[in-house]
Every structure is written in structure tokens, then in C-alpha cells.
């Protein structure tokens, strides 16, 4: 599909939303940590939207008491919707096309990774009913059936993609909305609940965890994968670390904080893995963000005038010129992964927790 008509159609609405400035998309700034309540906060980093380059500046604060990282001030619901729109205009995917960009950056979850997730839970249980939260197009449930053929998979997602997933047969049942809002309706229905890189984008991860506990039967398992803000890549790359993902990530939770909250809610952690969930894309992702920040911006709906053909041509040429460097960075990501994940560079963790009785 040609992108230009979509950009033209979106321009008036986008400019109207920005007429009062991007500050309107932020809630009041917090003076305490949303995780532990401590007032001991420090600014960890400030960033612009490095992927889409929409207007605005975003701050990640870190709590000195519990090390929780959170966007402060946080985006409002309207702001989150604004910055998550226009997925076809995401940096390298727009400049090189989605298939090549995903291959060079190594960010798309592979079939092997999905199967490994299912196998990780199968060690503890072969669930009868599994709910995948934030399922999107439901690729995980569709693939997990290969190793869990007797499990019924349902999906939950706020977007229309969940309806397509039901029609295509990737999930048995689809729930559109958020888990905190739907949890009472789903109470006690599932033996397993999964959240893969879902909590970081949630306004309130604690409510998501409460919803997961409510949806699970006693003895059921919760599987979580999340970006690890304590990894060495996060400190080395700073703003350019793809795991920061501003403004889309609202929370980055240290593993200890998540484990403590799971225990408080009545879970027993049965497995933790900081190696297998690693996505080998840090160097390539950081390079792509740097390239994107220096190229002329393409034809986007948040600029008042359409981009001239020359500017669009220069942008495409710049992306194609960067392909050899991106390919080299991707190769290094993959080659170094076995070593780096043993030395604190793993960029994600996986937690499997069992809901206690009662």
C-alpha cells in the first residue's frame, strides 16, 4: 500500500493535536516513585523520540531506593495513543522496508524464540488454557501449539489485531482491551498467562500483575519477559540503548523489584533466566537510532508541509548507505551474544512464577 495518501490524510489531525505543543501530552510530574513511594528520585536520561522523531522530550527517572525506572512526567492516554500511531513510519522500517530492516536489526521475534518460550513453561506444566497478554497478531500462540498441541490459547490485546487473530484461528478466543479492565471477567479461567515485553508499555505494571493473578487458577503459571535495565548495554549505550524505547516504554523494572512484587501478590518464582531471552540487537539498534537521528526527516504527518522529493531521496539514500554498517553491527550482536550474555550484557530477563493457593 502506498504510504503517501496515509500521510496526507493524517496531517491535519496530527497538526491539530500538536497545536498546543507536545507538553499537553504529559501528566503532572511525580515527586515520588510509583513502585515503592520513595521521594529519592534522580534524572537518569532525557531523550527525544529517536524512532519516529515526533516532537517532544521525555525523561526517565530512577528511584534511589528501589532502582525502578519510569517515565516522568508520564504520557497521558492521549499522548500514548499519539506516539504509538503511524507504525509504518518507524525509522529503518520506513527507510529500508520492514523485511530488510527487521532482518538487519534482528528485532523481530523468531519462530525459534517463540518455541523456546513455550518449552520453558512446559518444564513446569502443560496448561489446558493459556492467555497471551499483548498478543498482537498472535504469532506466539500459533507457534506454541507445535509443542503444546493440547493447550487452548486465548489472546488479549487493545487493538483490532486481536479480531484478525481470532478470524485466522491463531487463538481460540480473543479479548480486546486491557488486562486490569477485563481481569474480573476472566477470573480463574487460565492455567498459564504470558506477558512478553508487555509490562514496560503499561501505565501501571502492578495492576497488570494483579490482573494476571486473578485470571490464573491456583497453581497456574505466569511467564514474564521484560527488558533488563540493569544490563551493561543499558549503561554503555544510555539514550541509544534500544531497550529505553522512549516515549513508548513507561516503566523499566529491575528484576529484584519484580520478584518482590510477585511474592507480595502470592506467587512463588520457580525460574529466572537472564540469558535465553536476550535479543541480539543492541549494537545494530543503537546504530540505527543514530543514523535515523542524523538523516533528513521524510514525509511525515507531524510536519506542516510534505517533504520535498529531494529530501525523501536523500533519506532513502542515507539508509541504503548505512546497510553495510548495520549488517556488521548485526553480525557482531549475534556473534558476541553467547559471551556477552554470560557477562551481564543480556538485555532481557524471563521470570516464571506459580500462583500460590488462596
Give, region by region, the residue ranges found by the protein language model.
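Conserved N-terminal segment of class I S-adenosyl-L-methionine
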Residues: 2-196, 205-211, 274-275, 342-358
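Short, glycine-/aromatic-enriched active-site segment of Class I SAM-dependent methyltransferases
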Residues: 10-17, 224-252, 256-263, 277
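A SAM-dependent methyltransferase catalytic signature shared across enzymes that methylate proteins
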Residues: 34-42, 256-274, 328
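Conserved catalytic loop of SAM-dependent methyltransferase domains
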Residues: 50-53, 270-309
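Short glycine/proline- and charge-enriched loop/turn segments
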Residues: 98-99, 237-246, 286-292
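Phosphate-binding active sites in nucleotide-utilizing proteins
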Residues: 201
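Short glycine-dipeptide loop
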Residues: 216-222
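A transmembrane-helix-recognition feature enriched in membrane-embedded lipid enzymes
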Residues: 313-346
Amino acid at each position: 500500500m502506498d504510504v503517501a495518501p496515509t500521510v496526507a490524510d493524517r496531517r491535519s489531525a496530527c497538526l491539530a493535536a500538536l497545536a498546543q505543543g507536545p507538553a499537553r501530552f504529559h501528566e503532572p510530574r511525580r515527586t515520588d516513585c510509583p513502585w515503592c513511594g520513595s521521594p529519592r528520585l534522580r534524572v537518569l536520561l532525557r531523550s527525544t523520540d529517536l524512532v519516529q522523531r515526533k516532537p517532544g522530550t521525555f525523561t526517565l527517572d530512577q528511584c534511589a531506593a528501589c532502582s525502578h525506572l519510569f517515565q516522568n512526567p508520564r504520557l497521558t492516554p492521549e499522548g500514548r495513543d499519539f506516539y504509538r500511531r503511524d507504525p509504518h513510519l518507524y525509522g529503518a522500517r520506513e527507510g529500508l522496508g520492514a523485511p530488510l530492516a527487521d532482518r538487519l536489526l534482528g528485532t523481530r521475534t523468531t519462530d525459534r524464540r517463540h518455541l523456546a518460550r513455550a518449552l520453558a513453561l512446559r518444564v513446569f506444566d502443560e496448561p489446558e488454557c493459556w492467555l497471551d497478554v499483548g498478543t498482537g497478531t498472535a504469532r506466539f500462540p500459533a507457534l506454541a501449539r507445535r509443542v503444546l498441541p493440547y493447550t487452548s490459547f486465548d489472546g488479549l490485546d487493545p487493538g483490532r489485531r486481536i479480531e484478525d487473530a481470532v478470524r485466522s484461528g491463531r487463538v481460540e478466543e480473543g479479548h480486546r482491551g486491557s488486562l486490569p479492565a477485563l481481569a474480573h471477567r476472566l477470573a480463574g479461567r487460565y492455567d498459564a498467562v504470558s506477558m512478553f515485553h508487555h509490562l514496560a508499555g503499561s501505565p501501571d505494571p502492578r495492576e497488570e500483575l494483579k490482573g494476571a493473578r486473578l485470571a490464573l487458577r491456583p497453581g497456574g503459571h505466569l511467564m514474564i519477559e521484560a527488558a533488563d535495565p540493569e544490563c551493561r548495554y543499558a549503561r554503555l549505550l544510555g539514550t541509544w540503548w534500544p531497550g529505553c524505547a522512549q516515549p513508548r516504554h513507561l516503566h523499566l523494572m529491575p528484576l529484584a523489584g519484580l520478584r518482590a512484587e510477585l511474592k507480595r501478590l502470592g506467587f512463588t518464582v520457580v525460574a529466572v533466566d537472564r540469558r535465553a531471552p536476550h535479543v541480539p540487537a543492541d549494537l545494530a539498534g543503537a546504530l540505527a537510532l543514530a543514523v535515523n537521528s542524523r538523516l533528513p526527516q521524510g514525509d511525515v504527518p507531524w510536519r506542516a508541509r510534505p517533504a520535498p522529493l529531494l529530501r525523501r531521496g536523500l533519506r532513502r539514500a542515507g539508509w541504503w548507505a548505512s546497510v553495510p554498517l548495520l549488517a556488521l553491527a548485526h553480525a557482531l550482536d549475534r556473534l558476541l551474544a553467547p559471551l556477552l550474555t554470560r557477562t551481564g550484557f543480556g538485555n532481557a530477563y524471563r521470570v516464571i512464577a506459580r500462583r500460590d493457593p488462596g
